[in-house]
Every structure is written in C-alpha cells, then in structure tokens.
C-alpha cells in the first residue's frame, strides 16, 4: 500500500511516503504557520517522484490549528483529485472537498501526539493550551489511553508527580514550568507506519483538528 503521511501540528513539520515495510521518502523542516512554502515544495516533490498514493494520513493534533487545517485541506485536495496535477490552493481545495466527486484515495486522520518520534511504548504528552491551562494525555502503543484533558498548572503538576521517574513525559515546545518534560515532535514517518495497520482506530472524513475546547464562533452583529 502506498501511503502519504502529513504532519503540521507542531514547530517541526514532516512528510513521509511509505510503500511496503519502510519509508521511502521522509522530509522534515522548521514549520512556520506564516510560511507553508516548504510543505508544498516537498508535497510536489513526493508527487513527482512517486505519483498517486493509496492512502493519505494526516496528523490531527492537538497542536497548531492553522498548521493542521493546512494539512487537512491539502490532503482533501489530493484525495479528490486522485493525486495528480499540481497541489491545489486553499480555495480550490475547499471547493473540491465540498462539491467534488467520490475520492479515489483513502483519507484518514490520527492524533499527532500518538505519533511521537520516540522508542517509548508508553508516555505522557503535555502542552500549553493557553488561558492559563495545559493539556495532559497518556499514550500507550501509539493509541490514546487517557485524555487529552485540560488542567491548571497545579493540577498537571499533581498529576505528573504521581508517575515514577521511568515514565517518559514529552511536549512539543519547551515548558519552563515542567522541567521533566522533554521536547519531542510528532513524526510523519510514524504516521505512515501506523496507517498500514488495517485495524487502526483512524478518524474518517470530514477530518477536523483535535480541539481542546469548543471552536470559537463569532456571530456577526445585526
């Protein structure tokens, strides 16, 4: 099965192509939500080199909503277009996603925090959820065993104190409040590997970022 994996939820973006038992193409870069140029350059490169995938898997976070939406939009465009031609713009991608025909490529999503580049079979993931809150999740064998749950700093510190020193604790950015947390990033190569599992618990379209809170909707004044 030819698999294309896309991960843009953290400060390190990555893209991977897998055909068989190992990844044939892996790219990672410093991910800037204001500049998606490197992502689309690598996306064009992998298309030219390998052609059409059978499956596209997207990391859904939690993390950067902007980055995750870009990844989802690009994946929708490729799945609807059959993986041919140039990479669609955001506007074209959204139009195809709403009004296009049946996709010729399988499109799935998976929590980015379950695809951390590490050797640990079990670990905890924490992150800054803004508004003086943090999220906590526990991952076992690349699946969510707990969370993600929002907590105050005090609640998270109490939670972490219950784990012994052998438990790995990761975050996608440096959190000075929690010295024990090691910076690690989600990895498209791991996502591609997980997508090859026919029994995987994947999200199906319509794909959305993993929201830690309900999406904020502004109602226009009349």
Which residue ranges define each predicted feature?
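Bulky hydrophobic/aromatic packing residues
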Residues: 13, 46, 68-70, 82, ...
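DPxDG-like acidic metal-binding loop motif
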Residues: 55-83, 104-105
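Short amphipathic alpha-helical segment that frequently serves as the phosphate-/nucleotide-binding helix
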Residues: 39-40, 72
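A generic structural signal for ordered secondary structure
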Residues: 15, 49-50, 74-77
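Active-site phosphate/pyrophosphate- and oxyanion-stabilizing loops and adjacent acidic/basic residues
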Residues: 44, 76, 114
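Phosphate/pyrophosphate-binding loops at sites that engage ATP/ADP/AMP, CoA/4′-phosphopantetheine
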Residues: 42-55, 162-164
């Amino acid at each position: 099965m030819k698999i294309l994996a896309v991960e843009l939820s953290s400060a390190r973006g990555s893209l991977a192509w897998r055909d068989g038992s190992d990844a044939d193409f892996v790219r990672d870069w410093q991910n800037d939500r204001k500049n998606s140029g490197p992502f689309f350059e690598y996306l064009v490169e992998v298309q030219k080199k390998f052609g059409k995938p059978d499956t596209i898997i997207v990391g859904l976070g939690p993390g950067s909503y902007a980055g995750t939406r870009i990844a989802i939009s690009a994946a929708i465009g490729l799945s609807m277009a059959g993986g041919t031609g140039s990479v669609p713009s955001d506007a074209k991608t959204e139009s195809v996603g709403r009004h296009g025909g049946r996709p010729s490529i399988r499109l799935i999503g998976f929590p980015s925090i379950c695809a951390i580049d590490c050797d640990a079979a079990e670990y905890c993931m924490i992150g800054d959820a803004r508004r003086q809150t943090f999220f906590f999740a526990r991952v076992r064998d690349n699946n969510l065993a707990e969370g993600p749950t929002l907590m105050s700093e005090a609640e998270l510190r109490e939670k972490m104190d219950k784990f012994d020193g052998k438990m790995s604790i990761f975050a996608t950015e440096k959190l000075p409040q929690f010295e024990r947390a090691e910076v690690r990033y989600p990895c498209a190569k791991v996502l591609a590997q997980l997508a090859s599992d026919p029994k995987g618990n994947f999200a199906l379209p319509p794909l959305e970022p993993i929201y830690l809170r309900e999406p904020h909707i502004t109602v226009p004044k009349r």
